[in-house]
Swiss-Prot record:
E.C. code: 2.7.1.50
Designated gene of the protein: thiM
Gene Ontology terms: biological process: thiamine biosynthetic process; thiamine diphosphate biosynthetic process
Keyword Nucleotide-binding: yes
Protein name: Hydroxyethylthiazole kinase
Length: 265
């Protein structure tokens, strides 16, 4: 828990600039989430300015939600540039497994090297070649033990930190694995909440190593969701309260409400 508190403190002190190449559906949502937490967002995907923008950024988040051939070129190029410049990269392979194009582009980006891969059970399964576990951008049902094993297997296969999100979130770098129990089911009734997590992971990975960064993002967001639900029981007001609690969350709140533990297979 101490590393989560320290990571949040660093984000607010350093206000990292997070370069998001993300989808049209969530640009506003994720930018506001980053601002509420204390980071600085930029949403830019033009291929012509990628190198300049990435030089300015502290981390890069790639989200394939509204993918097309132009976005693919920008995303692959951004991954290559960020790696050359030593900037951490978060990949959110939205809808991988739903279409061959999404799966292929996600694997193409992964092959260049990313620091964090965050997706639901179906998306991560698809990237490992397991089909039939995705419906659109949503994951079909699975067991917690399956999710834990999938997270560790994917981390080892892709040599990166992997988060598999769900009722329980699992994070692994192939050696250590954390389970995060924070969150609320109403998140599933608001579009873009998974994309928010990817963006926040970008803020955290700018200030600490990937395993701690990803775990910190999931715990922070999960607590914010729980606290938001205490004050707003319906999706519209809940969405607004999420921003409020990303802004309000602090050391005392994390110490009181964090539900995270290291697990073994």
């Amino acid at each position: 828990m101490k590393f989560i508190i320290e990571a949040l403190k660093r984000v607010r002190e350093r206000r990292p600039l997070v370069h998001n190449i993300t989808n049209f559906v969530v640009m506003n949502t994720t930018a506001n989430a980053l601002l509420a937490l204390g980071a600085s967002p930029v949403m830019a995907h033009a291929e012509e300015e990628l190198e300049e923008m990435i030089r300015l950024a502290d981390a890069v988040v790639i989200n394939i939600g509204t993918l097309d051939s132009g976005w693919r070129r920008s995303m692959v190029k951004a991954t290559e540039i960020a790696n050359e410049l030593g900037k951490p990269i978060v990949l959110d392979p939205v809808g991988a497994g739903a279409t061959k194009f999404r799966t292929r582009v996600s694997l193409e980006i992964l092959s260049r090297g990313v620091d964090v891969l965050k997706g639901n059970f179906g998306e991560i399964s698809a990237l490992l070649g397991e089909e039939g576990k995705t419906r659109g951008v949503d994951s079909l049902e699975y067991g917690e033990e399956e999710a834990k094993k999938l997270t560790m297997n994917a981390a080892r296969e892709f040599n990166t930190t992997v988060a598999v999100t769900g009722a329980v979130d699992y994070v692994s770098d192939g050696r250590r694995t954390f389970a995060v129990y924070n969150g609320h089911e109403l998140l599933g009734r608001v579009t873009g909440t998974g994309c928010m997590v990817a963006a926040l992971t970008g803020a955290f990975v700018a200030v600490t190593e990937p395993l701690k960064a990803t775990t910190s993002a999931l715990v922070t967001f999960g607590i914010a969701a729980e606290k938001a639900y205490e004050e707003a029981k319906y999706p519209g007001s809940f969405h607004v309260k999420l921003y409020d609690w990303l802004y309000r969350i602090n050391e005392n709140v994390i110490r009181t409400y964090a539900k995270v533990r290291e697990v073994e297979l």
